[in-house]
Amino acid sequence: ERIAALNRQNNNKVPSNSGNSGSAASSTGGFLYPLPYAVSITDAYGYRIHPLTKKYSWHNGVDFGAAAGTAILAAKSGTVTTAAYSGAWGYYVVINHGDGYSSLYAHQPSCSVSVGDYVTQGQTIGYVGSTGWSTGPHLHFTIYYNGSDVNPLNYVSMS
């Protein structure tokens, strides 16, 4: 109950877009769903018990469970500012979309784009993998606004 209350409290702080909805291939608030088809959310945005450390901690994105090798799509056009490896995220990519927005795509098997590349909305920028701190193939997807993470589900829609 405490976790649910904290998630509700935090979600109230996040800017949301007004009521747009669409299919997995549509855009909400200008952001495209980052996979070619809808999949299950395996870990939500907000406080949770971390599946590996077993500690109560903040999860700054949404985990979409998908088959290894599934294409990852650029949620919005922009310039790749990071294509790197980290212990937690494994191989990951960050795209700067301008107007204060950027997006992160983690746990890829490798980086398919390079820093400085301009990518277009819907372009394949990588593939689902399980590198870094991961319990199985999935896409960890984060949207940042002015450097702070926001709930991606307020910007994209699964339905």
Where are these regions (language model features)?
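Catalytic cores of peptidoglycan-degrading enzymes
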Residues: 27-159
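Alpha-helical oligomerization segments with coiled-coil/rod-like character
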Residues: 1-29
